[in-house]
Regions:
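Active-site beta-loop-alpha junctions enriched in small/polar residues
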Residues: 6-10, 34-38, 73-76, 114-116, ...
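Histidine-acidic metal/acid-base catalytic patches
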Residues: 1-4, 12-29, 62, 137, ...
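Short glycine-enriched, charge-decorated loop/helix-capping segments at active-site entrances
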Residues: 43-48, 84-87, 125-127, 223-228
Length: 287
């Protein structure tokens, strides 16, 4: 199993050859390309400019032996999904992210559920479900046209009725599109009271398109390194092996979540993190 990490963990910008080289030297051959920030220039690109930008990044990554296997679609904090106009604007940016995902050669664009009532309340669960059902039915059709899949992500928001892996799985099955699968976030599982391995098994190989791997103590989405929180990593690896997961083990943590690290200490810690990822991935393959 390959291991991966987000572009921002190593790269200062899209042209950072030294960052690519260091990433590859530390054992990573897979990458998540982050498009969460809706102010990124790519969202203002004309189609030809977007193609040039994404193809240039893909070629640079591949020249270093790294493939972009997944991306992260647009996201605003706090959520801005309350009105039809806001959801339409978000939909358009997500379509851009799906096209960019295809141009990068990735197969999955990770996207969060729509949160029309915010992230800490759910006064109308049926309305929340209907909005998301309509939204992702349309968006998954666009994903199919692009030749990619949405990885609908479980959320660390216990108040929402569309946050837990089982709820995400139910929506994905109801829509039933080849363009809609699941990204399982291990840290988010813990915040909603579930061990990641217990979430992996019901999803299964066919619908588990991507991973976000990190840890916490169950009280908040802290993006800590694996083995520093409450996740049962042996069981998580076992579950991945049981379902035959074939994607990369993608970290969603880095030195940024470790604290302010002196420059001369950074690389040994980066290597340590990559070895942790390698341990989890190897355990999944051997189990």
């Amino acid at each position: 199993m390959r291991i991966g990490i987000g572009n921002t963990a190593y790269l200062r910008d899209d042209n950072d050859d030294a960052g690519f080289a260091r990433m590859r030297a530390h054992g990573y051959t897979s990458m998540n390309y982050d498009m969460a920030d809706t102010a990124l220039p790519l969202y203002g690109d004309a189609p030809a400019a977007l193609e040039r930008r994404m193809r240039a990044f893909r070629e640079r990554a591949e020249s270093h032996g790294i493939t972009v296997d997944q991306t992260h679609g647009p996201w605003r904090w706090p959520p801005q999904d309350a009105t039809e106009e806001q959801r339409t604007e978000r939909f358009e940016k997500m379509c851009t992210a799906l096209r960019a995902t295809a141009l990068l050669g990735a197969k999955c664009c990770v996207i969060h559920p729509v949160m029309p009532f915010g992230c800490d309340k759910d006064p109308a669960p049926e309305r929340l479900w209907a909005i998301n059902g309509a939204f992702f039915s349309r968006l998954s059709a666009e994903a199919e046209r692009c030749g990619v899949a949405i990885g609908l992500e479980n959320m660390p928001m216990p108040a929402l009725s569309l946050a837990r892996p089982a709820e995400i799985l139910r929506l994905v099955r109801e829509i039933g599109s080849a363009g809609l699968k699941i990204c399982l976030d291990t840290g988010h599982c813990l915040v909603t009271g579930q061990q990641p391995g217990d979430a992996v098994r019901p999803i299964g190989r066919d619908l588990l398109a991507a991973l976000h791997v990190h840890d916490n103590d169950g009280t908040g989405d802290f993006h800590r390194w694996p083995f520093t929180g409450k996740a049962d990593w042996a069981d998580f690896s076992a579950a991945l092996g049981e379902i035959g997961f074939s994607g990369p083990l993608m970290l969603e943590t880095s030195l940024r979540f470790f604290g302010h690290v002196p420059a001369d200490c950074a690389e040994p810690l980066q290597i340590a993190l990559s070895r942790i990822a390698r341990h989890i991935a190897d355990a999944a393959e051997s189990g």
